[in-house]
Curated annotation (Swiss-Prot):
It comes from the Bacteria. This is Dihydroorotase. The keyword Metal-binding applies. The active site is at residue 246. It comes from Vibrio atlanticus (strain LGP32).
């Protein structure tokens, strides 16, 4: 197959940052997505409804494509209240709340120190029908960075799923076979997003032949056996897995340093990169469900009414892209991608 028309996709996990860079990140994410769920770990984090609505206004001020709708999320802290959850739900603009274990990833220092501290908040979320988004890693110093997702599943997420069976939960950017199996075996209220870079790459790509800082992200790339399990899950047609890029830009200098930031930028070509994976697996016919159907179905939203067309046509990716007054190195920068949006 050399051409494929699919329902317009959505991105259910993306970082746009804030300030002068919004003009560039909004341009890329709105190019063909109908909706994008905007992560709240900005500086300062989006911890209440007023902040979420103000952030949404700043995004919309960049005049994204007419079809584009940003969806907002709250950043959960130990001090989040049930009343704030109800207020967010009533706003109509905030569709989820995000659990960042404190210190697990970029700008997460204000996150939740213990899941038990927000159980009353999770109860309110279950009651009003607000989704819980989860960065699934523990932060204990004695847990190896490659094992943090598995440990989180066992010690944090499994109890939450058990204690809140009617709470819809999205395990974000899964990176292990363990996570894929957990989601498959969990009740129908548990789903997961999978990034393009975790499907395309494993830790060898990041570490062999020299450190490749633009592959460094959190959760970190795992061994190839986990990569293969993610590919199987994403391309399987299962309604439990859907597109969430976790596109997370940092300026080139912030990545290429002695203490580089975590995050890979894929918003410039997300659906094209996913198409490569599905095509290589001989499952290109399942791309539409993963990219365009499963996400809105799980969130209880209508699917987009229009379409985009992909063609199997190689194109060159710019080595760098504008990022406010700086530049960002995108995934595949200076290389080619096999599929293009027509």
């Amino acid at each position: 197959m050399t051409q494929l028309t699919i329902t317009r996709p959505d991105d259910w996990h993306v970082h746009l940052r804030d300030g002068e860079v919004l003009k560039d990140t909004v341009r890329d994410i709105s190019r063909y997505n109908g909706r994008a769920l905007i992560m709240p770990n900005t500086i300062p984090p989006v911890t209440d409804t007023e902040m979420a609505l103000a952030y949404r206004e700043r995004i919309m001020a960049e005049q994204p494509s007419e079809q584009f709708q940003p969806l907002m999320a709250l950043y959960l802290t130990d001090n989040t209240t049930p009343d704030e959850i109800r207020k967010a739900k009533e706003s109509g603009a905030v569709v989820a709340a995000k659990l960042y274990p404190a210190g697990a990833t970029t700008n997460s220092d204000s996150g939740v120190t213990s899941a038990q501290k927000i159980y009353h908040v999770l109860e309110a979320m279950q009651e009003v029908g607000m989704l819980l988004l989860v960065h699934g890693e523990v932060t204990a110093h004695d847990v190896d960075i490659f094992d943090r997702e598995k440990e989180f599943l066992d010690t944090v997420l499994a109890p939450i799923v058990n204690d809140f069976p009617n709470l819809k939960i999205v395990l974000e950017h899964i990176t292990t076979a363990d996570a894929a199996t957990f989601v498959k075996n969990a009740n129908e209220n548990v789903a997961a997003t999978i990034t393009a870079h975790h499907l395309l790459y494993n830790r060898n790509h990041m570490l062999v032949g020299g450190i490749k800082p633009h592959f460094y992200c959190l959760p970190i790339l795992k061994r190839n056996t986990h990569q293969l399990a993610l590919i199987e899950a994403a391309t399987s047609g299962s309604k439990k897995f859907f597109l969430g890029t976790d596109s997370a830009p940092h300026a080139k200098g912030a990545k290429e340093s002695a203490c580089g930031c975590a995050g890979s930028y894929t918003a410039h070509a997300a659906v094209e990169l996913y198409a490569e994976v599905f095509d290589l697996e001989g499952k290109i016919e399942n791309l539409e469900a993963f990219a365009s159907h499963n996400g809105p179905d799980f969130y209880g939203m209508p699917r987009n009414a229009d379409t985009i067309t992909l063609v199997k046509e190689e194109w060159n990716v710019a080595e760098t892209m504008p990022f406010g007054s700086d530049i960002v190195v995108p995934i595949r920068g200076g290389e080619t991608i096999a599929w293009a949006v027509k």
